[in-house]
Amino acid sequence: MDCKILVLGAGGLGCEILKNLTMLSFVKQVHIVDIDTIELTNLNRQFLFCDKDIGKPKAQVAAQYVNTRFPQLEVVAHVQDLTTLPPSFYKDFQFIISGLDAIEPRRFINETLVKLTLESNYEICIPFIDGGTEGLKGHVKTIIPGITACWECSIDTLPSQQDTVPMCTIANNPRCIEHVVEYVSTIQYPDLNIESTADMEFLLEKCCERAAQFSISTEKLSTSFILGIIKSIIPSVSTTNAMVAATCCTQMVKIYNDLIDLENGNNFTLINCSEGCFMYSFKFERLPDCTVCSNSNSN
């Protein structure tokens, strides 16, 4: 059976996932969704893009790159917010693989897929494979809606500060004041000294200006707030992206070839490359009181 795959995100992880899919003969069509555009700072790890692509939509450029070089695979780009797409869009795919860098879109797609499964009485059950990276660490969650733990079941495994901003494309679509601070401090003025009072006051001024451009509240903005954000910024590492993307695609291949026990097999993989290379897989159990997938909420 030929497969139609949906990839969420065309950043560092999404590019790696898309590259891997070009090498799978059973994958005939891939749709990729991303609202962001390409920035100079992306080019060190998002290798489907180059200098001439700066300012262009990521999904569009990634699709064009693959379609030109791999004619056996059709890639369709969607330059939009995935939360604006209707449920009918998602039900056409055999697998959905996420390379997203934000929490809320993951929660949205998880809830959408669980709802599709339950409302169809399991006639529609689309595996959702979620990859995530944070510096030299990463994870892969394999979710079979209505059968295994859903994404919401494991939300308590996230760091307590969920709004820690990864080093990704925030230039054209800042959603909060944290995104503003990251852009100003790491892209516009990366050489300022955070120990200098004058430099921190300058950053505060520039953050206020950028926030005003995007109608973002500056209520909690201060030099101490900016310092806290700068210290929490996590870089994106290409090798971690490659390992997580490979694990995502391996899980998909296992499911496609019926090589995994969907109900009782391991569905959560942790990757830690901060001291050597460590990978650990285990079964994450469903929460009986999960607000998305528990029996009490699905009736």
UniProtKB/Swiss-Prot annotation:
Key words, A-Z: ATP-binding, Ligase, Nucleotide-binding, Ubl conjugation pathway
Entry EC no(s): 6.2.1.64
InterPro entries per UniProt: ThiF/MoeB/HesA (IPR045886), ThiF_NAD_FAD-bd (IPR000594), Ub_act_enz_dom_a_sf (IPR023318), Uba3_N (IPR030468), Ubiquitin-activating_enz (IPR035985), UBQ-activ_enz_E1_Cys_AS (IPR033127)
Known pathway: Protein modification; protein neddylation
SUPFAM superfamilies found in the cross-reference section: Activating enzymes of the ubiquitin-like proteins
GO biological process: protein neddylation
GO molecular function, one term: ATP binding
Residues spanning the signal sequence: none
Domain of life the protein comes from: Eukaryota
Residues forming the catalytic site: C168 (glycyl thioester intermediate)
Catalytic activity from the UniProt record: ATP + [NEDD8 protein] + [E1 NEDD8-activating enzyme]-L-cysteine = AMP + diphosphate + [E1 NEDD8-activating enzyme]-S-[NEDD8 protein]-yl-L-cysteine
Binding site for ATP: 12-37
Gene Ontology CC annotations of this record: cytoplasm; nucleus; ubiquitin activating enzyme complex
UniProt subunit comment: Heterodimer of UBA3 and ULA1. Interacts with NEDD8 and UBC12.
Misc. comment: Present with 752 molecules/cell in log phase SD medium.
Biological role: Catalytic subunit of the dimeric UBA3-ULA1 E1 enzyme. E1 activates NEDD8/RUB1 by first adenylating its C-terminal glycine residue with ATP, thereafter linking this residue to the side chain of the catalytic cysteine, yielding a NEDD8-UBA3 thioester and free AMP. E1 finally transfers NEDD8 to the catalytic cysteine of UBC12.
Name of the protein: NEDD8-activating enzyme E1 catalytic subunit
